[in-house]
Amino acid sequence: MGSSVNRYDPRNIETMELVYGKGYMSAGGDAEVARILTGIKIRNRQLLDIGCGLGGAAISLVKDHHARHVDALDIDDDIIRRAGELIEATDMDDRITLTRFDGGALPYHSDQFDVIYLTATSCHLEDLYGFFSEIHRVLRCGGWVVGGEWFKAADNSAYRDWDS
């Protein structure tokens, strides 16, 4: 594991949560989670939430959509700590596992997850080919990658190749 990472000023985290709702750092909240999952049944499925932020989506995936278990990753130590507090306060800590992850190979076995959920994550990455290769490795055959992004990195050739 690399050194401690805190990418967000705590005041910004608190402001985002005030604007977007408890447990969220991006727009939409639980309704956005439901929209992203439209047509995909996750009941009793194993999910990976990459870039879990404050844990709101992971909680919704378990509580509202009945995922069996969610492994949730984020790079920021303070955000992971805050997510852990929220997950514990909502009694979801037996169904949501938090891990600080700072890139490279995902710390999971191949073919481990039924669904990979990500929002506002890949837009922060340089090595999209490596990122999506790792997603492919840990996703079970027939699984789903679902999510949304703030923007498309048009100047990134790996993204253009993936997007075409």
Positions of the model-derived regions?
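Class I SAM-dependent methyltransferase Rossmann-like catalytic core
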Residues: E14-A27
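A short acidic, Gly/Pro-enriched loop at the edge of an enzyme's catalytic core
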Residues: G104-V115
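Conserved alpha-helix/loop element of class I SAM-dependent methyltransferases that forms part
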Residues: S26-R43
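A short glycine-rich, Lys/Arg-flanked "PGG" loop and its adjoining helix->strand segment in the class I
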Residues: Y129-W144
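N-terminal, positively charged/glycine-rich alpha-helical extensions of SAM-dependent methyltransferases
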Residues: M1-E17
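Class I SAM-dependent methyltransferase SAM/SAH-binding core
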Residues: L48, L54-A105
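A short SAM/SAH-binding and catalytic strip from SAM-dependent methyltransferases
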Residues: V115-D127
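Short, glycine-/aromatic-enriched active-site segment of Class I SAM-dependent methyltransferases
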Residues: F151-S164
